[in-house]
Amino acid sequence: MASFLHNFLLFFCSLSLIILTSSATKSQTHVPIRPNKLVLKVQKDRATNLHVVQIHKRTPLVQFPFVIDLTGRFLSVNCENQYTSSTYKAPVCHSSQCARANSHTCRTCSSSKTRPGCHTNACGLLTTNPVTQQSAQGELAEDVLKIPSTQGSSPGPMVTYPHFLFACAPSNILQKGLPKNVQGVAGLGHSPISLPYQLASHFGFPPKFAVCLTSSPGKNGAVFFGEGPYFMKPGIDVSRQLTYAPFTIGQQGEYYINVQSFKINNAMLPSIPKGGFGGAMISTTTPYTTLQTPIFRALNQLFMNQLRGVPHVKPVAPFGACFDANRIPTSKMGPTVPSIDLVLDNKKNIMWRIFGANAMIQPRPGVMCLAFVDGGMRPKAPIVIGTQQLEDNLLQFDLMNSRLGFSSSLLFRRTNCANFNFGTSSTNTDP
């Protein structure tokens, strides 16, 4: 009898321990993940030189490519191309979601059958193709979005934003000039429903994001949301040793930095307007830095004066200063040419240095050109800093303090923007 009682007690204790352990394990697997940093992989499209980010949306979950746009105010999605999701909703006009999106327009869909992007009494948003600047009214919508978390060195578990706000855009404006098969535009601009603001607000981390665009098609650059560190192989925190400068916001949510002048080999650009050139817009949808005609001509002349001993050749459009590529040696920083400094604050010696890899382009064999183009007499901004000059540089946007942190070329630190360890992110998600 004593032996039976002893065995029964052992069995009961073992069973209780198994139940408690199972319950604890189950509880742990359902603890909501509150990440302090998120990451998306971004690739350079060979045909357009635009950069495309992969985003998971809908129910059931599907991954889609979107062009990243630093001037975009929200995520614009082609909802006319078989958009199927059980969690799609169109907030009604004058709702709190519409107020958050600064939408004060009620739209009516002419179709008798409702579908994603076509609801009556929904909120209207003006959607724009960032390449062609073609615009059309779209529908404010919300749906599930999932995104990989990270501690800074590799992707972690996917986390969920169940009611992410975006715009359903007409398919005809999301085609011309954009990479094949993209499903819309990922807006990173200064707006309440842009990706950076929504993600920071939902997950509770500081409103900061960083862009690291790769120069190599087929490889992955990264867009980080949240504070650093951001590690690139071999274990380099590229968020350290940044130079900082204030930025201002344009009417459409664009980011501008003040450029006082250009400097090449310590030679300052002549004929500088009082106070400098003013706002230089940073753009991920402009392939090469675009300059107002007088600035373009002056910079080309100064660069040709400083690049001595290299024969000039006939310019290849759209570039203005081209050279015999066989006479330009290369190094880890790209073509060995004089570096170009964007002088942001001459008194404080704050400069953004552009080395050969970002300054030069080889449009055809044997020819190398200065990768700056003429924007005409009345461009959107006197200077638009394009992706050729942004690639393999880390740019961190601190939205709370209106401050830009920039690394200059990561090649100088023996790494680049394709060196984030994406590996394979976990499929585990939070609620």
From Swiss-Prot:
It is found in: Secreted, Extracellular space. It comes from the Eukaryota. One of its GO terms (cellular component) is extracellular region. Residues 51-407 form the Peptidase A1 domain. Disulfide bonds join 79-168, 93-106, 98-123, 109-118, 322-369. One of its GO terms (biological process) is proteolysis. GO terms for molecular function: aspartic-type endopeptidase activity; IgE binding. Keywords: Allergen, Disulfide bond, IgE-binding protein, Secreted, Signal. Pfam families: TAXi_C, TAXi_N. InterPro entries: Aspartic_peptidase_A1, PEPTIDASE_A1, Peptidase_aspartic_dom_sf, TAXi_C, TAXi_N, Xylanase_inhibitor_I-like. The keyword Nucleotide-binding does not apply. Residues 1-24 form the signal peptide. The record marks 271-276 as: Cleavage. Two-subunit monomeric unit made of alpha and beta subunits coupled by disulfide bonds (at pH 4.5 and under non-reducing conditions). Monomeric alpha and beta subunits in reducing conditions. Can also form oligomers including dimer, tetramer and cyclic hexamer (trimer of dimers) (at pH > 5.5). Component of globulins complexes which accumulate in seeds. Interacts with flavonoids (e.g. apigenin glucosides) present in globulins complexes. Sulfur-rich seed storage protein that remains undegraded at germination. PANTHER family: ASPARTYL PROTEASE-RELATED, BASIC 7S GLOBULIN. This is Gamma conglutin 1. It comes from Prunus dulcis (Almond). The lineage of its organism: Eukaryota, Viridiplantae, Streptophyta, Embryophyta, Tracheophyta.
